Every structure is written in structure tokens, then in C-alpha cells.
Regions:
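Conserved class I S-adenosyl-L-methionine
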Residues: 92-103
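Conserved SAM-binding loop and adjacent beta-strand
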Residues: 69-82
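Short beta-strand element of Class I
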Residues: 118-122, 199
Length: 210
């Protein structure tokens, strides 16, 4: 599954499914039991395919579809907010970006698309149950994009990870914090910024703190 190509299927109601084209019989939530490779490999982009009683349309695996079909555990940053943060921080190709609070990787997916193969994305997440989902989503995205940044992930809190960050990059162009508490994280992360670098804080809603 790790090396299987990606297919995107959409339903008439707009629901999106991201399918790994493995050559084996599997049960996929919302679709049913099928062999993804034999069922979908010869279906062209824009063509319809019937699986069970449902009709699906195959689309190219682009960022909007992959975000809609991503696995979720933590509440994700939406595309609108992700775009604003990327623009305000001036993030682009070749940048080194640190994101603390990987979660399900909604923000990281937008970052990866923007940064391209010349960028370097560093993610930090203290909760393994969240990072496992986020890293899987990033792995899926890496198979779909023509370019994907260098990626280093650190398990732990940003306040405790300064030395580990320095091991992979001496400094960073931008920092994004999506955490319940920001003051201590800002104090820990700010010294990593290059001159002219920028830092943003995304404040969680109450449900994320529960």
C-alpha cells in the first residue's frame, strides 16, 4: 500500500474518496469491497465507474480533492485559513518552514503544495494518535504531487525540541503554531527564525481543547 498509486473518486453528492490502487481485495468505507487496482486502473480521468449500486467519477488527485478525502482525527485548518497564513508569511519555493501542531496535516498539505521539491517542511506533534493520521495524509499527498518538499517530523513538544530542530535546520523562514497554548511555544521557536522570518499562531476553538 505504501507504494501504490493514488486514485480519486467523487460521488454525485460531492463526497470524495482517496483510494490506493493496491492489487488485493479490500473493504473501503463508503465504497464497498473491491480490488482497487483491477477496478480502477483502466478507468480514465473523467470517466464513470459503477461499484455496487453507486456511480463514481475518477478525477486527477489534486490538492482540493485530497484535502476533501483526507483522513481526519484532529480538527483541521481549512483551505481558506491555510491560504491566508501562507500568503501572510510569504511562504514559497525553497523555504524552510516549521509547523508545530501537525494534527491531521491539513495545513501541512497546503504548505507542501506551495513549497515544492526545493522546500523543507519540519513538523512537530506531541500526540502520536494525531501524528499517525497526519503523516499518512502527507504520505498520500507525496504520491500525488509532481513535487514534494523534504520533510522531517519530530515527535514531542516544540518547547522540548529546540536541539532536534537545529539538527535538521539551523534556522527557518516561517513558523506556524497550531497549539492550545502559544506563549511558551513562541518563546521556544522565535530564536529559530531567520532575519525577516515570520511566525503565526492559529488559535484553536473550544472543541479542540477538550
Amino acid at each position: 500500500m505504501a507504494d501504490a498509486p493514488i486514485a480519486v473518486l467523487t460521488e454525485g453528492n460531492g463526497r470524495v474518496h482517496v483510494v490506493h490502487l493496491i492489487d488485493d481485495s479490500v473493504k473501503i468505507k463508503g465504497i464497498g469491497v473491491l480490488n482497487p487496482y483491477t477496478t480502477l486502473n483502466d478507468v480514465g480521468m473523467g470517466e464513470e465507474v459503477q461499484i455496487g449500486s453507486k456511480i463514481f467519477t475518477r478525477l486527477p488527485p489534486r490538492l482540493p480533492e485530497l484535502v476533501l478525502g483526507m483522513k481526519r482525527r484532529a480538527q483541521t485548518i481549512g483551505s481558506k485559513d491555510a491560504g491566508v497564513l501562507i500568503a501572510r508569511l510569504g511562504i514559497g519555493a525553497g523555504d524552510v518552514v516549521l509547523e508545530a501542531g501537525l494534527g491531521s496535516a491539513g495545513q501541512s498539505m497546503h504548505l507542501a503544495r506551495t513549497m515544492g521539491s526545493s522546500g523543507h517542511l519540519i513538523t512537530i506533534e506531541p500526540r502520536e494518535e494525531h501524528s499517525s493520521v497526519g503523516l499518512e495524509n502527507l504520505s498520500t499527498l507525496s504520491k500525488a504531487l509532481p513535487e514534494f518538499p523534504k520533510h522531517d517530523h519530530i515527535d514531542g513538544r516544540i518547547e522540548d525540541s529546540f536541539d532536534r530542530i537545529k539538527e535538521v535546520s539551523n534556522d527557518v523562514d516561517a513558523i506556524l503554531l497550531d497549539l492550545p497554548e502559544h506563549p511558551s511555544a513562541i518563546q521556544a521557536a522565535a530564536p529559530l527564525l531567520k532575519i525577516g522570518g515570520r511566525l503565526s499562531c492559529y488559535c484553536p476553538v473550544s472543541s479542540q481543547l477538550e
